[in-house]
Amino acid sequence: MQNLVSNRRKSKRIYVGNVPIGDGAPIAVQSMTNTQTTNVIATVNQIKALERLGADIVRVSVPTLHAAEQFKLIKEQVDVPLVADIHFDYRIALKVAKYGVNCLRINPGNIGNKKRIRSVVDCARDHHIPIRIGINAGSLEKDLQNKYSKPTPEVLLESALRQIDILDRLNFDQFKVSVKASDVLLAVRSYRLLASQIDQPLHIGITEAGGARSGAVKSAIGIGLLLSEGIGDTLRVSLASDPIEEVKVAFDILKSLRIRTRGINFIACPTCSRQEFDVIGTVKELEQRLEDIVTPMDISIIGCIVNGLGEALMSNIGVTGGPRNSSFYEDGIRQHHRFDNKFIIDQLEARIRAKAMMLEENNKITVINLPKK
């Protein structure tokens, strides 16, 4: 089945660490730590947890020079590329560049005078570090606030182009741009305007989207709209929640649009009085148990025969509820074995894990060592 994205926007290619960004590269998932950066152990543990779930890039706030020293210790203990989030003090950018940061998230306009901006850009150039220009509707320049009275797509665009012009004048093109807002329509319209004006990679997201539920909904709509139009090269789902949830929602959005698949896509009915087993409890438990599986798979769990067969025929593994025991399908073929409804969770987990192992084995590339001439 084809994805919903047509004519993905063409952009320049940059690299954040070893992760390619733009120019047709896979859309990268990013999250951000919410620990105190000076708490090295907690920050490292959170970064590693995000990486295990599939985060391609992790952003870390570095608000002080002391935090920059701790960033060095953090960088030494993780493998995933790190973005340092820096504002106001240009010296922090110079310091983390020496410590191996993979990207600087700054606004050139709030780093200081032209000499300081040049110092940061020259440092980034010397260390082959890209920059992300991050425009946010909540922190626009005062003169633009006075000019427009309220955030609009036009003011976010003007702010972005102002920052981009600074880098252009310094002959620096290794950067990506974001124009975020907490209002979904404002963010979407701003990104559309920006995408029509520049060919740099775009980092997309709905900033300060809210809690786990409402934030996920806003992000799915906003990010989904942009991705469906071919706009976006990296993304972050910003939630007032555990950053782990950000990565989960991000991959759910990408899976829903069939842009990038990772892990299990659960297809489950909302249940009614026809269900023959506890569908909701089964899905909830399996989602937790099978978080470690990265193999793309479609798993249908339907409580009765009304839609169960149709979904099972299109799934890697499907179960259709029946009285006392349920029908089991693999790759659309009904199996002789049936699941006892009392033990359906354990039985499904075993079958799904076995299927994942088989798919992984089939997808392995056989390396043939040719004899040396």
Swiss-Prot record:
GO molecular function per UniProt: 4 iron, 4 sulfur cluster binding; 4-hydroxy-3-methylbut-2-en-1-yl diphosphate synthase activity (ferredoxin); 4-hydroxy-3-methylbut-2-enyl-diphosphate synthase activity (flavodoxin); iron ion binding
Q: What class of enzyme is it?
A: oxidoreductase
Which EC number(s) are documented for this chain?
1.17.7.3
Gene3D superfamilies, A to Z: Dihydropteroate synthase-like (3.20.20.20), Sulfite Reductase Hemoprotein, domain 1 (3.30.413.10)
Q: Which reaction does it catalyse?
A: (2E)-4-hydroxy-3-methylbut-2-enyl diphosphate + oxidized [flavodoxin] + H2O + 2 H(+) = 2-C-methyl-D-erythritol 2,4-cyclic diphosphate + reduced [flavodoxin]
Stored InterPro entries: Dihydropteroate_synth-like_sf, IspG_bac, IspG_bac-typ, NO2/SO3_Rdtase_4Fe4S_sf
Tell me the cofactor note. Binds 1 [4Fe-4S] cluster.
Q: Which UniProt keywords apply?
A: 4Fe-4S, Iron, Iron-sulfur, Isoprene biosynthesis, Metal-binding, Oxidoreductase
Please name the SUPFAM superfamilies in this protein's record. Dihydropteroate synthetase-like, Nitrite and sulphite reductase 4Fe-4S domain-like
Provide the binding site for [4Fe-4S] cluster.
C269, C272, C304, E311
For this entry, list what GO says about its biological process. isopentenyl diphosphate biosynthetic process, methylerythritol 4-phosphate pathway; terpenoid biosynthetic process
**Cofactor(s) for this UniProt protein:** [4Fe-4S] cluster
Pathway membership: Isoprenoid biosynthesis; isopentenyl diphosphate biosynthesis via DXP pathway; isopentenyl diphosphate from 1-deoxy-D-xylulose 5-phosphate: step 5/6
Superkingdom: Bacteria
**Record family assignment:** Belongs to the IspG family.
Say what the protein does: Converts 2C-methyl-D-erythritol 2,4-cyclodiphosphate (ME-2,4cPP) into 1-hydroxy-2-methyl-2-(E)-butenyl 4-diphosphate.
Protein's recorded name = 4-hydroxy-3-methylbut-2-en-1-yl diphosphate synthase (flavodoxin)
Give the lineage: Bacteria, Pseudomonadati, Pseudomonadota, Gammaproteobacteria, Candidatus Palibaumannia
Gene name, Swiss-Prot/TrEMBL:
ispG
